[in-house]
């Protein structure tokens, strides 16, 4: 019999219940007990949703981040929070969110002067994790309480529980040695803690534990590869059986290593590594199970079940009961339930599957394998009909878009003159001071903004009323910026629910869900648009709002656009053509908008590419191909303007030392980047690479409620000036201010502007 299991389930709830519970608690509007009760309710519901599986994951739920939870389980707390003796959950929030000392209050979630932990992307996804912190003296001590509590909850509900933990090698690989020490030297200290944790699982009656080692799909150097055998030799004596899980890519040169580790089962991503399955099946021990991830855990398209069965049936004949099937990775990256969607176009809806529907697909495959296709004949027929409907749909294919793609040539990506000539013209046109100040684009999404948008979408407010409400917010944002003394202003993006969804809603080839939310970090959720067909722009998308904002001020107003690479990487993308083709289609659409903004008199245009690095393949050997079409797409979008028009781009969480040459090839006049959480370490890239254009290193972390100190901003900019000539530096936050409150934004920007004025005095 084929065994079914899941690697992880979305934790936010079908209607973002976790998000709202967290934010209510952080505001002091609910108790810790109430927050924990919401968590327990979500876990119970999600286990019930997975009751049809042979094994359900336990420990995949986290109030903020699973890597942060693993740090606490291993007793690896940053030094700055070790003196806190309150509830562990509040301490985790201290690490995740930070807190400025003068922002402290008596609420239990208050964090008292604590810097937020560094946050970065989880492999090549749009999920963020809190980076574990190490140094030479790091010690580990087990705290299994969170996992044991969830196991007891699951057992009380009758769940066949499979605890999920991050493996020791991946955990060290994900972290950062603050003193530059060798992280691998910590492995001997870490392994006894893992062994003790496995013994706790045995004592709880656990049969299988899932240990995630996704680092095995990356290009590891010899030292990291060599760490696996002693690590798993040290854990092999435990009585609980271990399923080693890899996902997000192919094993390649690590395949033989993975197959030889002393574990009881191996999971591989059969979406990205299908060609390796036969080799893995031949190499794993005859006593080991092989779990194949046959349902795509990172996209929203229905699985072609007939094709999947045709591939699985021979494998099942070979492996028999040793075959397990699962999604390719945790369903954390998938929306929860397609059945919540009431407004989706019926045809397009028939092509989709969210997390719960993916589990339906999984159990249907198992039924067909265990009992024969005849028992699910009707379901297979319906699936085949949906697959063919999508393949042949005229809504997917647009001849005019394909013709425009065919006409692309190198000239579309070229500015008239090189940066030095452009910079001189832009300086004359904009007349900005030294260390010019700006923000990244968005300002707080207030309750009034959200209410107006909700009423407009519900038909309770007509467009005239909605437009008036948005113009009121834009006017406020402009006035606040003028009062603060910022140099290049933004309109604040009041009209935008999300930096990708906003554009997708206005592009042909996209469709939108109501409840297709996925977690980005903490309480931050995003609702990626669904790119289902060829992309085109029917009409201007932003010009009206930017022109209104520009009319409110004599200062330069930035046009704000999301770049083609980021729109692509933050969408659920069609899987019937190369991503590069979809990206070029997006580039042509954004190019049209850029030219319309310039025609309307906008002289500073920002094209955000926050997710450029996120799209990098996990293997460096595959980077060049991606970077070539990603940079080309940006240049197509940006480079049709006159020399006097200044093009900005923004990148967040982008450790870009290793792609700095490609970023320079984008040829944006100004790039703004996230550097505050890493204390300007990202600027190390400029020690060895002469970046030719202007740069704005983010001087404070907008993901934390901390208010930046003026002197600290000055110090950060002085560090930046050691690498970048002062005349090419901008002063800005590290990201948009959408998630902050005005009460936090105004003092933060006030200190930032004051710091810039201090810096000008020294020029």
Swiss-Prot record:
Zn(2+) binds at residues 650, 652, 674, 735. One of its GO terms (molecular function) is 5-methyltetrahydropteroyltriglutamate-homocysteine S-methyltransferase activity. One of its GO terms (biological process) is methionine biosynthetic process. Binds 1 zinc ion per subunit. Its cofactor is Zn(2+). Keywords: Amino-acid biosynthesis, Metal-binding, Methionine biosynthesis, Methyltransferase, Repeat, Transferase, Zinc. The active site is at residue 703. 5-methyltetrahydropteroyltri-L-glutamate binds at residues 16-19, 121, 524-525, 570, 614. Pathway: Amino-acid biosynthesis; L-methionine biosynthesis via de novo pathway; L-methionine from L-homocysteine (MetE route): step 1/1. It catalyses: 5-methyltetrahydropteroyltri-L-glutamate + L-homocysteine = tetrahydropteroyltri-L-glutamate + L-methionine. It is an enzyme of class 2 (transferase). It comes from the Bacteria. L-methionine binds at residues 440-442, 493, 608. L-homocysteine binds at residues 440-442, 493, 608. HAMAP family: Meth_synth. Belongs to the vitamin-B12 independent methionine synthase family. Catalyzes the transfer of a methyl group from 5-methyltetrahydrofolate to homocysteine resulting in methionine formation. This is 5-methyltetrahydropteroyltriglutamate--homocysteine methyltransferase. It comes from Paraburkholderia phymatum (strain DSM 17167 / CIP 108236 / LMG 21445 / STM815) (Burkholderia phymatum). The gene is metE.
């Amino acid at each position: 019999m084929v065994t079914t299991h899941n690697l992880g389930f979305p934790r936010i709830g079908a209607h973002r219940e976790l998000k709202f519970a967290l934010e209510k608690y952080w505001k002091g509007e609910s108790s810790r007990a109430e927050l924990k009760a919401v968590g327990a309710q979500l876990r119970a519901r999600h286990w019930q949703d997975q009751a049809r599986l042979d094994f359900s994951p336990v420990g995949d739920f986290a109030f903020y981040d699973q890597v942060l939870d693993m740090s606490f389980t291993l007793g690896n707390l940053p030094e700055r929070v070790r003196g806190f003796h309150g509830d562990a959950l509040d301490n985790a929030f201290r690490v995740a969110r930070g807190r400025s000392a003068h922002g402290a209050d008596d609420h239990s979630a208050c964090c008292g002067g604590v810097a937020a932990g560094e946050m970065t992307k989880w492999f090549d996804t749009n999920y963020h994790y809190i980076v574990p912190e190490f140094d030479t003296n790091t010690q580990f001590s087990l705290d299994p309480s969170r996992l044991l509590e969830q196991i007891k909850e699951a057992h009380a509900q009758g769940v066949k529980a499979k605890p999920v933990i991050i493996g020791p090698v991946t955990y060290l690989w994900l972290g950062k040695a603050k003193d530059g020490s060798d992280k691998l030297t910590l492995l001997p200290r870490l392994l006894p803690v893992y062994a003790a944790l496995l013994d706790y699982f045995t004592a709880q009656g656990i049969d299988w534990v899932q240990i995630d080692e996704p680092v095995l799909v990356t290009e590891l150097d010899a030292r990291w590869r060599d760490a696996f055998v002693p690590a798993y030799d040290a854990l092999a004596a435990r009585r609980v059986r271990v399923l080693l899980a890899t996902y997000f890519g192919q094993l390649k040169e690590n395949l033989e290593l993975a197959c030889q580790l002393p574990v009881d089962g191996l999971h591989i991503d059969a979406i990205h590594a299908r060609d390796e399955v036969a080799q893995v099946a031949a190499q794993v021990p005859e006593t080991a199970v092989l779990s194949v991830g046959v349902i795509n855990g990172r996209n929203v398209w229905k699985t072609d079940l007939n094709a999947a069965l045709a591939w699985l049936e021979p494998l099942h004949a070979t492996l028999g009961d040793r075959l397990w099937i699962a999604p390719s990775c945790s369903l954390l990256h998938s929306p929860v339930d397609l059945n919540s969607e009431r407004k989706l176009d019926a045809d397009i809806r028939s092509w989709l599957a969210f997390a719960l529907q993916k589990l339906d697909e999984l159990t249907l495959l198992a039924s067909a394998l265990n009992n024969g296709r005849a028992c699910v004949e009707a379901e297979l027929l319906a699936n085949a009909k949906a697959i063919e409907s999508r393949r042949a749909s005229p809504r997917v294919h647009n001849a005019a878009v394909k013709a425009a793609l065919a006409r692309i040539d190198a000239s579309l990506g070229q500015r008239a003159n090189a940066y030095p000539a452009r910079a001189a013209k832009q300086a004359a046109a904009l007349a900005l001071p030294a260390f010019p100040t700006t923000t990244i684009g968005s300002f707080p999404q207030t309750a009034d903004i959200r209410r107006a948008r909700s009423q407009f979408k519900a038909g309770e407010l007509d467009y005239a009323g909605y437009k008036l409400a948005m113009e009121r917010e834009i006017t406020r944002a402009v006035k606040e910026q003028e009062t603060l003394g910022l140099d290049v202003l933004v309109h604040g993006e009041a009209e935008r629910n999300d930096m990708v969804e906003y554009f997708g809603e206005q592009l042909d080839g996209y469709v939108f869900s109501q409840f297709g939310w996925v977690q980005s970090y903490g309480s931050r959720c995003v609702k990626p648009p669904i790119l289902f067909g060829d992309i085109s722009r029917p009409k201007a998308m932003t010009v009206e709002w930017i022109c209104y904002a520009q009319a409110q001020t004599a200062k330069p107003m930035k046009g704000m656009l999301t770049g083609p690479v980021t729109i692509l990487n933050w969408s659920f993308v069609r899987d019937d053509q190369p991503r590069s083709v979809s990206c070029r289609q997006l580039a042509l659409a954004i190019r049209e908008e850029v030219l319309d903004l310039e025609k309307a008199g906008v002289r500073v245009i920002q094209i955000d590419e926050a997710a450029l690095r996120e799209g990098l393949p996990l293997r460096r050997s595959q980077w060049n191909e991606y970077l070539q079409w990603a940079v080309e797409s940006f240049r197509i979008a940006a480079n049709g303007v006159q020399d006097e028009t200044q093009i900005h781009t923004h990148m967040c969480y982008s450790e870009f030392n290793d792609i700095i040459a490609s970023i320079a090839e984008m040829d944006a006049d100004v790039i703004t980047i996230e550097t505050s959480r890493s204390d300007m370490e990202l600027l190390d890239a400029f020690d060895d690479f002469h970046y030719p254009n202007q740069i704005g290193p983010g001087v404070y972390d907008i993901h934390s409620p901390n208010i930046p100190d003026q002197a600290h901003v000055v110090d950060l900019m002085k560090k930046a000036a050691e690498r970048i000539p002062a005349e090419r530096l901008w002063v800005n936050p590290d990201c948009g201010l959408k998630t902050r409150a005005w009460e936090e934004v105004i003092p933060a920007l006030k200190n930032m502007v004051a710091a810039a004025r201090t810096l000008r005095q020294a020029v």
